[in-house]
Amino acid sequence: MFGVDELGLDLGTSTLHMVVRGKGIVLSEPAYVAYDRQTRNVVAVGEEARRMYGRTPAGLIVERPLRDGRIRSFDLVSKMLRYFLRKVVGKRATFRPKLLLALPGGMAPSERQTLVDVIVDAGVRSVVPVDEGVASAIGAGMNIDIGGGRTNVSVFSFGHQIVWDILNVGGDRFDDAIIDYLRKKHNLLIGARTAEELKIDIGSARMRGVKLEMDACGRSLVSGLPRAVTVSSEEMIEALDEPLRDLMSALHRMIERTPPELASDIFDEGITLSGGGAQLFGLDGVISDQLKIRTTLADEPDLCVAH
């Protein structure tokens, strides 16, 4: 528990971060909720709920309240935030901190207001919203912020967002592509957790100096029985080809929409990648090669918004 009056909240699609002024990041947990199917009572939140994903009995459901950059359940968001707020500030009923909220990009005004109302109801005094793209740029300069559900692409000038776009490509799309690849190439059905582990451990946007391999366990689509196959980092390049091509096409369109003066600034200063999805091996090099613009990975890319 922390004695705090002001909090920062990065409500990410896959991970939630809370920040305390003067103390930095005090909480970083997966944005998962496990609840009873009939009563909708919450039984686990965060890392505990994530560990249950894909392994729950029929009466329990584990899901992420946010998906593809959109809020799927305001009720679950409220319950999740109540849990995390108690974890950070304690159970004092009269203590209600002020909260700076990094909003997922592309939310409709009505959706934003509903989210703000839900957060206030969860136990904060007031909410100051800011776009994730702006928050990540404050942390790392002009950047491409690749989240779990979406990618925010922003160009700033004198502190103002001049050109921006929201792309339906993110870490979840990478996971789905890996699942689809193993289904087609190896007749193996794997879960989202296994796909994420493959992405993190051997996922690649370009050739590595050393070939990596990892066993992927799932269900054979031929026999219906459990089966394991060995997957290489080179196969991951093939698996991720389609979402990466979509990402590059969208980035090309964004550059074309940028005023010439700002495009010149981008060329001179380069691009910074942030967000959890930006950690895919070789992605910075692929973007740099294809856009002909120096591209670097931010320090602690998954924490840029929180910082």
Task: Give, region by region, the residue ranges found by the protein language model.
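Residue-level signal for beta-strand positions within conserved beta-sheet cores that form or flank
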Residues: 149
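A structural feature that tracks compact, well-ordered secondary-structure segments
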Residues: 152-154
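Nucleotide/phosphate-binding catalytic cleft detector across ATP-hydrolyzing
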Residues: 1-146, 156-272, 278-306
